[in-house]
A protein has these predicted regions:
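Acidic, polar ligand-binding/catalytic clefts
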Residues: 82-119
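N-terminal (or domain-start) structured segment
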Residues: 25-93
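Bacterial N-terminal signal peptides that target proteins for export
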Residues: 1-9
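Sec/Tat signal peptide C-region and signal peptidase I cleavage site
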Residues: 17-24
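An extracytoplasmic/periplasmic, membrane-proximal ligand-sensing/linker region
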Residues: 178, 184-185, 195-204, 208, ...
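Bilobed "Venus flytrap"/periplasmic-binding protein-like clamshell domains
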Residues: 27-53, 58, 117-185, 289, ...
Length: 318
């Protein structure tokens, strides 16, 4: 009789245990970018870091996306621990129903809250060694590859207009994925790429073809109305000094659906695992607490708690 009672108790405990474990596990959906992009790779790295840093208590499911606008729009229908990446400026545009969010304003956009910055979209103007180009004016008469439909292509086209090069360069009809071979065989003199640094295609171009990344002047950066960014010396082969360029900050956001404890855990784990992520992928090395300045809207209270604990500087709108 006693044995049967103990057996029943053990069965009861075993039945409850999986449910208890499931309750303690935090599940997060992380909406990223196209699966072929560096930002999708970053999302996978963050997912692994969260699992390792939380001893398995945080499980991140990475979802592919067609871009930042889609990520923001999905806030309307998503509930719970939905995390997504986007340039901070898109949150302000969404709230105001402007640009790509015209006639799409929704109260849910007011519930978006920032967690932490990730590597910025960094502009690279890459010129071949053979071209001899060392500044923007030298691009006149050259063949340049911008690509199509991407942020880098749109931004590159904008800069050509801003800096007086519209109609003065030949735009190559080559896919951006073929930029390095086209540069090496002389089909193009240069290409424009936007991505976190160090960018794989720029690494290859610099190492195998002696390509040079152009620096922008202070005036050019001001004209672009983008965020200034310095690519440290030695990032690319043959780069003896820092490169001044522009960037579009990117941040991981959640909504007020996420409780403070989860937001705190995600933020704390991200920063505590950043050094190990940097060892595996250099693009994390450029992320710092100073990049909180790029967040234009509210920070999640749970994330803010962590930033206050480490003495990070927060703005009044945070």
């Amino acid at each position: 009789m006693k044995f049967k009672l103990i057996a029943k108790l053990l069965l009861a405990v075993m039945a409850v245990l999986p449910a208890t474990q499931a309750m303690s596990e935090t599940r997060v959906t992380y909406k990223s970018a196209k699966s072929t992009s560096s930002y999708y790779q970053m999302a996978v790295q963050i997912g692994k870091a969260m699992k390792a840093g939380s001893n398995g208590d945080i499980t991140v499911t990475v979802e592919e996306s067609q871009g930042s606008v889609q990520n923001v729009m999905e806030v309307v229908g998503r509930k719970g621990n939905y995390v997504f990446t986007t340039p901070p400026v898109l949150i302000k545009l969404a709230r105001g129903g402007k640009a790509m969010f015209k006639e799409k304003a929704n109260p849910r956009f007011d519930e978006i809250r920032a967690l932490f910055p990730i590597p910025s979209l960094t502009m690279h103007f890459v010129m071949s060694k053979k071209s001899g180009v060392t500044n923007f004016s030298g691009m006149e008469g050259k063949t340049i590859l911008l690509g199509k439909g991407s942020f880098g292509a749109r931004e590159g086209e904008k800069y050509l207009k801003l800096f007086g090069l519209e109609g003065k360069v030949t735009l190559a009809e080559v896919e951006l994925s073929n930029a390095v071979p086209a540069l090496k065989n002389g089909q193009i003199d240069g290409f424009v790429a936007a991505g976190s640094y160090p960018a794989p295609n720029v690494i290859e171009a610099a190492a195998s073809a002696g390509a040079k990344v152009l620096s922008l002047s202070d005036e050019q950066i001001k004209l672009s109305k983008r965020t200034r960014l310095e690519i440290p010396a030695g990032t690319y082969a043959g780069q003896s000094s820092a490169i001044s360029t522009t960037s579009l900050p990117v941040v991981a956001f959640a909504t007020t659906d996420m409780d403070d404890a989860t937001a705190y855990a995600l933020t704390k784990t991200f920063w505590e695992r950043k050094s190990s992520m940097s060892a595996a992928a250099k693009w994390w090395g450029g992320v710092s607490l100073n990049m909180l300045d790029n967040i234009l809207t509210e920070i999640h209270p749970g994330a803010a708690k962590y930033y206050q604990e480490v003495g990070a500087k927060l703005a009044s709108h945070h």
